Design a protein with these regions (language model features):
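Residue-level signature of transmembrane alpha-helical entry/exit and packing/kink sites
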Residues: 5-9, 13, 86-93, 119, ...
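Hydrophobic alpha-helical transmembrane segments of multi-pass membrane transport proteins
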Residues: 6-76
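Small-residue-enriched core segments of transmembrane alpha-helices in multipass membrane transport
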Residues: 10-18, 90-103, 126-131
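Transmembrane alpha-helical segments that form the membrane-embedded catalytic/substrate-channel core
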Residues: 18-26, 98-107, 132-136, 187
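Short amphipathic alpha-helical coupling elements at transmembrane boundaries
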Residues: 28, 36, 40-44, 109, ...
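Alpha-helical transmembrane segments and their short interhelical loops
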Residues: 49, 54-116, 173-178, 182-188
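Transmembrane helix segments
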Residues: 112-153, 157-158
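Junction motif at the cytosolic side of a transmembrane helix
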Residues: 178-207
């Protein structure tokens, strides 16, 4: 049981690190641009503000992948628990698992454009991510539709039991993909709504 707990902590910490990078890079990025007074300049970009922030988020996640990989090796070496790390399995699962975190980042990035100083809420969400990662999907299957829940379960299974991506049930893969696309899409839509709302209220450049 203790061994399982250690392995769970390793996997959970890895996913949490990735999620915070994906979520925080977007929400905090928008808040910083507003503080520095450069937010409106980004909106005048020919590429559009949303795509610019999305690219920044991808870069943040890639950096998190690098540091997460190093941290994973260190944690496994320190604990003596070597997990299965198949890149063809772990990378796609992590990418799809953190997509809802990007969606949440878009939501709070949009809210920070409209309501400005909400950084305290950003910190609370980081703790909420821990709860989502620890969701007991096995006991309560309906909870797998929550952000990060299904990805966390599948990542634990892949790394603790050595299950390959193509060996997962089709239903599990479907839930992972649907939740990733749905939360990311809803978050991006909410971001654009808040952006237009801020422009209508004339508070885009205020902080």
């Amino acid at each position: 049981a203790i061994t399982d707990s250690i392995e769970w902590i390793i996997v959970g910490y890895l996913l949490w690190t990735m999620s915070v990078a994906a979520y925080g890079g977007l929400s905090w990025g928008v808040a910083r641009e507003a503080q520095w007074g450069t937010l409106e300049q980004l909106f005048m970009s020919p590429f559009g503000f949303g795509p610019v922030m999305a690219v920044k988020t991808v870069v943040n996640v890639l950096e998190a992948f690098l540091w997460g990989g190093v941290t994973l090796v260190v944690m496994m070496a320190v604990t003596g628990r070597w997990l299965a790390v198949d890149p063809l399995t772990v990378v796609p699962i992590v990418a799809l698992a953190v997509a809802p975190a990007v969606g949440i980042g878009f939501v709070f990035g949009g809210l920070s454009i409209r309501f400005k100083r909400i950084e305290n809420a950003f910190q609370l969400v980081q703790f909420l991510l821990i709860g989502l990662i620890a969701t007991p999907v096995e006991q309560y299957p309906l909870l797998r539709w929550l952000p990060l829940a299904q990805g966390s379960k599948m990542l634990r299974t892949a790394m603790q039991e050595g299950v390959r991506l193509w060996a997962f049930p089709a239903a599990d893969l479907a839930v992972l993909v649907v939740t990733a696309v749905a939360y990311l899409g809803v978050g991006y839509a909410a971001f654009h709504y808040c952006q237009r709302w801020a422009r209508r209220e004339g508070v885009m450049g205020h902080y």
